[in-house]
Each structure stands twice: as structure tokens, then as C-alpha cells.
Amino acid sequence: MFLVPLLAALSLSAPKVAAHGGVLAYSLAGTWYNGFVPYNTPTGQSTIQREWDTYNPITDPTDASISCNINGASLGSAQKSATVAAGSSVTAYWNQWPHTIGPVMVYMANCGGDCTTATTSSLEWFKINQVGLVSGTLTSGTWGMGQLVANNNSWTTSIPSSLAAGNYILRHELLAIHTSNQPQFYPECAQLIVTGGEGATPPASYLVKLPGAYSMSDPGVNIDIYSHETETNYTIPGPAVWQG
């Protein structure tokens, strides 16, 4: 029932929105938060999600926008942050998602202070969840992205229970690889205030910059799945998952 008002708003926006999709809302430990509405002015919008302007993909893994999507700016005084305890579940909801081939990745970054003033490309990101090729082959197997679609265009993960309290940005990313050697990155960011935890922080080996974590030389980025139809292995790009 929560989706109806926002879906109605999205239906009034530009025709481009018919392609691809994006995160329209979050559920954090059972509390619902509407996201930013793209193709609309940020004036009057107040949300935990960082601004993003288009459903179009980022196709260059070194693009400056890859941390939090095209624009990716905070909403200034209208920007919110959701308070959530370490160990809580987080669900992101996409309004639509047509692609089923590719990995789903979830990152976080400690802002070291108020995230509203943070520059996301300067943060150090760590991965808390990823699902790539679950079973089968590259072209006909089950992918994380396929699981997202099957689960009503949603993805649920948990904030590491040991994570130190603080101000964080949560980043969901879909990497669509259905077009040969033309990766499509779809990142979305939201601001959190994490409470509780056990004071743990990921070691340096788990931290990356965005851009900086990916390149076209990565086998999981620059890939032609149709030339390897019987392949049953896929290497998810980026760092290993930090589980706390």
C-alpha cells in the first residue's frame, strides 16, 4: 500500500522512466522511507536518499558519478538520515526492474561526521553483501538480479551487527551485463545513522574508493556472456564482503 502514491508520482515524470528503474523506497528495521523522485525538481523533496537524476545507466566504471549515481548530491537542509541499529535488516524497493542477468552489491561508507556534507567519491566504501551467479550458466542461470526481480523488485540485507556506531551512506548497486562488453551500473545511495554495534570497522583491505574499485579490465565488468554460454563461474567486481 505504500507504493501507490510514489508510483503515481513517477508515472507523471518524463517518458525516459519507462526504461530500466531505480530505488523508490526503503524499509529499515520495519520503518518505511520514501526515496527521491527522479525527473522532478529536488525542491520540496525531503528524503534519506541522495538525489539522482535519471534511470539511465552509468557505462564507464571510472565515471565520477559511480559512487551515488548521476548527480548524487545531498538535498542540503532537506536531506534526512534514517536511524537504525547495527544488525537491522534493510530492504530497498525498485519501482521496476527489467534485467535479470548480473550481480547485486551493497556497500556502506563511514562519513566521519554528518553525511549531508560528505563528498561520496572521497569516501572509503566497504561491501556488506553481494550475490552474483547463483546457479547455472551465465546466459540461462539464476543471478542475484534475477532474485531481486522475483522478490517483487526488492533486495534485503542486514547491517553488520558488529559495525561501529556512526554516520554512514548505504549504497545499493545493480550491474547489468546482458549487453556484450557494455556494463551498466545502477547505484543508489541513502544516509543512515547507525546505533549500537560493537565498535568494529573494516580493515583497509576491504576499503575502496568509488570511482576506483572497478575498471574495464575486470573480468566481471567487461564481459560477453554470449561467447561463454556454458560458463558457470562469474567474478563479482570490487572488494570482498566484510561481514563484521
From Swiss-Prot:
Chain residues that bind O2: H178, Q184
Please give the organism.
Answer: Heterobasidion irregulare (strain TC 32-1)
> What InterPro entries does the record tag this protein with?
AA9, AA9_LPMO
Q: Which reaction does it catalyse?
A: [(1->4)-beta-D-glucosyl]n+m + reduced acceptor + O2 = 4-dehydro-beta-D-glucosyl-[(1->4)-beta-D-glucosyl]n-1 + [(1->4)-beta-D-glucosyl]m + acceptor + H2O
Q: Which family does it belong to?
A: Belongs to the polysaccharide monooxygenase AA9 family.
**Its Gene Ontology molecular function terms?**
metal ion binding; monooxygenase activity
Disulphide bridges: C68-C189, C111-C115
| Listed Gene3D superfamilies | 2.70.50.70
Q: For binding Cu(2+), which residues are annotated in this chain's numbering?
A: H20, H99, Y186
Q: How is the cofactor bound?
A: Binds 1 copper ion per subunit.
Any recorded use in biotech or industry, and what is it?
Lignocellulose is the most abundant polymeric composite on Earth and is a recalcitrant but promising renewable substrate for industrial biotechnology applications. Together with cellobiose dehydrogenases (CDHs) an enzymatic system capable of oxidative cellulose cleavage is formed, which increases the efficiency of cellulases and put LPMOs at focus of biofuel research.
Q: Does the keyword Secreted apply?
A: yes
Record-level GO cellular component terms? extracellular region
Which residues are tagged as glycosylated in the record?
Answer: N152, N233
Fetch the Pfam families from UniProt: AA9
Q: What is this protein called?
A: AA9 family lytic polysaccharide monooxygenase B
> Is Protease among the key words of this record?
no
Q: Which keywords has UniProt assigned to this entry?
A: Carbohydrate metabolism, Cellulose degradation, Copper, Disulfide bond, Glycoprotein, Metal-binding, Monooxygenase, Oxidoreductase, Polysaccharide degradation, Secreted, Signal
The places in or outside the cell where this protein is found are: Secreted
Residues reported to bind (1,4-beta-D-glucosyl)n: Y39, D224, Y226, E229
Q: What is its EC number?
A: 1.14.99.56
Q: What does this protein do?
A: Lytic polysaccharide monooxygenase (LPMO) that depolymerizes crystalline and amorphous polysaccharides via the oxidation of scissile alpha- or beta-(1-4)-glycosidic bonds, yielding specifically C1 oxidation product. Catalysis by LPMOs requires the reduction of the active-site copper from Cu(II) to Cu(I) by a reducing agent and H(2)O(2) or O(2) as a cosubstrate. Displays catalytic activity on insoluble cellulose using I-beta microfibril model substrate.
Q: Where is the signal peptide?
A: 1-19
